[in-house]
Amino acid sequence: MTGVQTCALPIYEWLPMLPIARAHGAYLYDVDGRPYLDAISSWWTCLIGHSHPHIVAALKNQLDTLDHVIFGGCTHEPAVALAEKLCALTGLDRVFYADIGSAAVEVALKMSFHYWQNVGQAKKVRFVCLSGSYHGETLGALSVTDVALYRKTYGPILLEPIITPAPDAYQAPAGVSARDFAIMQAGQLEQLLAARSDEICALILEPLVQCAGGMRMYHPVYLERARAACSTHGVHLIADEIAVGFGRTGTMFACQQAGIRADFLLLGKGLTGGVLPLAAVLTTEVVYQAFYASYASQRAFLHSHSFTGNPLVCRAALATLEALEAEDTLNKNRALQVAMAAALAPLSEHPNVAEVRQTGMIIAVELVADKASRSAFDWRERRGLRVYQHGLTRGALLRPLGNVVYLMPPYCITADEIQHLASVITEGIAIAVA
């Protein structure tokens, strides 16, 4: 990489970027051949491992036939087949393609708003999100993101959301179960929708795990109550499963654990096995019909991108879904979930660990300055970064979220590799809190 300037931020002057040359399975390899176990699936995307042979073969074959075509006035087999497969998996009726997760959020927000305009409820212009939520970094997605740094920086140009308290079990008072706390928080949502549904288009949430917000986890009963409240008060429910879909929470989709169907289901990241960018917005026939009208009516949904429905990305997604099914991945993951829990359980006794929490193939360790009070380390001390640095010396790619160290590995990881990562994290925490 001689002559290539990669120092985009001051941190890279003393902590250089990893020059990755290739990847296979659960590993990344730098230009010198050094392996790094990808503990975070390269930002939660490479579900079944890097360079999966079935995906690679499917892409090579697709590239020989159709690489790209405008998706306005044209269609093609990969896009149709993928839409049919996604509808069959989710129980929803219609699919709108986007390229990245943030774009899918934009589509859902616009489509919900536009739906209400088309059916004559023009006062519905507001969105509700959960405290601590994260839905992406385009302007619309940031508008329903409750992260202080983003709102402080971009607040003047963002929409103003209505924020309702999240059911984050970590915040539950002593002696209150995760389920009871979720019901308590759902009660506040129910009151909000009852009072202000005439101005609210939709509630958007991340089912079961608020990932970028610190791997905050909550009980499925909140989703049940949220679905019921939205249905009662005529508000759309947008389920952002971009990070947690396709088995990450233990079921194919997180919403299944609550037995609910959202009005909009957002998918991305692992949809293509992490090979290419693709996102999808699934919705109901009711929503679709609100836009199905003549040109003269001017009721059509207004959203398009140059690479919408690209044949290569659709083929990669189909291959990913085929591999998940053929390899019985979700059933096999049960043993990996047990291995993750067992490997990191000892850390729950550490004096600087407030909690080890897990949902499916996500497990997180919350570092604190004091266990009894759960007082946090000063964010400026960057304790999580110290764990990351140690991981690199031991051939592990971690990416803590502040003081939360987590594993979100590819499904091809082994029990031995999980144990290795647990050892690396344990060592890293000892260094970080010293």
Residue ranges: model-predicted function:
Residues 1-7:
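Single conserved hydrophobic/aromatic residue that forms the stacking wall/gate
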Residues 8-434:
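Conserved N-terminal phosphate-binding loop of PLP-dependent enzymes in the Aspartate aminotransferase
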